[in-house]
Amino acid sequence: MEPQDPVKREGRLTPVIVLATLIAAFGSSFQYGYNVAAINSPSEFMKDFYNYTYYDRVGEYMNEFYLTLLWSVTVSMFPFGGFLGSLMVGPLVNNLGRKGTLLFNNIFSIVPALLMGFSELAKSFEMIIVARVLVGICAGLSSNVVPMYLGELAPKNWRGALGVVPQLFITIGILVAQIFGLRSLLANEEGWPILLGLTGIPAVLQLLFLPFFPESPRYLLIQKKDEAAAKSALRRLRGWHDVDAEIEEILEEDRAEKAVGFISVLKLFKMRSLRWQVISIIVLMAGQQLSGVNAIYYYADQIYLSAGVNEDDVQYVTAGTGAVNVLITVCAIFVVELMGRRFLLLLGFSVCFTACCVLTGALALQDVISWMPYVSIACVISYVIGHALGPSPIPALLVTEIFLQSSRPAAYMVAGTVHWLSNFTVGLVFPFIQVGLGAYSFVIFAVICLLTTVYIFLIIPETKSKTFIEINRIFIKMNKVPGVHPEKEELKEFPPSTARQ
């Protein structure tokens, strides 16, 4: 019988897992990517709307400073909302579950979609600003909860591949927004409210279909203490009846952590047994955002123009870059279980480091050497490829893998906070760096890529095809502690967690 064959059972991707992955990623991660890019193409039309609306109210147009400030607020509200969403992860996933949080999160997509879609009709740019905060909260929650949910659904030998799927849908969301954002489609005076309002469609589809799929078995067994529901979920996910071995592995994790209860962010920073895990997610998440990925996209249009690309055609080249991003992320899904997480991180950050160094030289010399702009384009594409291989998809996957059930929600809160604050910082600071350093702006990002690469080489272990307990044992040795959570006496000073109730 098939259930007696451990190889088949270990490697099986069932329709339930595949569909749950696609619905969770499309309904949540896709929106993150879509809202990152959707606001770029119609920006001039939206600024005109801001100005005309202001004129209708007070009888005069905004001055340049006030318009720029208002637009900067509009753009920056998205990462600010992402930061707020990250702070909500722990309480929501512990009380509503992983699937329940994703369903609840659709509120933060449908409401802002309506606000943005009807903002022109209502003659209110304030509706757009509020909506950007709300879709930011949606992105902050989804960027943490989707990897957690999929990581807990997946069998260990598919955890890496499924863990990359959220990043794939982020890149697809960016590409779809770039395509819809072509001037011939929706990036025009009539179409921009529709472009912004389309973000609600994936949320509606997720609300309709995700309830038919299982909650995380780990959440059901460890936090809800419902073994029958956990077994039922596992049977649907694995496609066979005998799930006792996996139930026992989850219970082993539960027994190892039972003495400390569920861990808050404050506890997370206090515990010696989690020291290197916490440092690692901070370094990886900061490295992911501070390595210059947003700056590369910010600078790309100027690089394409300097290489002689017609101004009207830059939008198509940008969409082509987005397509490369999607293609390489698809490749990452297939190679992450072959090459491992550590290798892809090292390769990705190394490629980004090299691309930043060469790009600096190319930008400095493009007025002297005629073919240097083409080198700059090659550097942009190389950087996008490198980032899509490792720095973009792997850090969120590792947060799921290097923390056990009790500390995972708090770890995602820390990781998400670092991610969004770093994102916000780059968006705020890079324009000033660009003015001050010009072509040499990317030296800073090259240094960050190099330092992150060195840290990964020295510290980050390979987690491929290991159970959560096996990964934790690696960190027990690194943290030089005798067990999973030896500091039980230290933790008595903290108030008990209510997450298990």
Curated annotation (Swiss-Prot):
InterPro entries: Fru_transpt_5 (IPR002442), GLUT (IPR045263), MFS_dom (IPR020846), MFS_sugar_transport-like (IPR005828), MFS_trans_sf (IPR036259), Sugar/inositol_transpt (IPR003663), Sugar_transporter_CS (IPR005829). This is Solute carrier family 2, facilitated glucose transporter member 5. It catalyses: D-fructose(out) = D-fructose(in). D-fructose binds at residues 32, 167, 288, 296-298, 387, 419-420. NCBIfam families: SP. Coiled coil: none annotated. The modification N-acetylmethionine is found at residue 1. Pfam families: Sugar_tr.
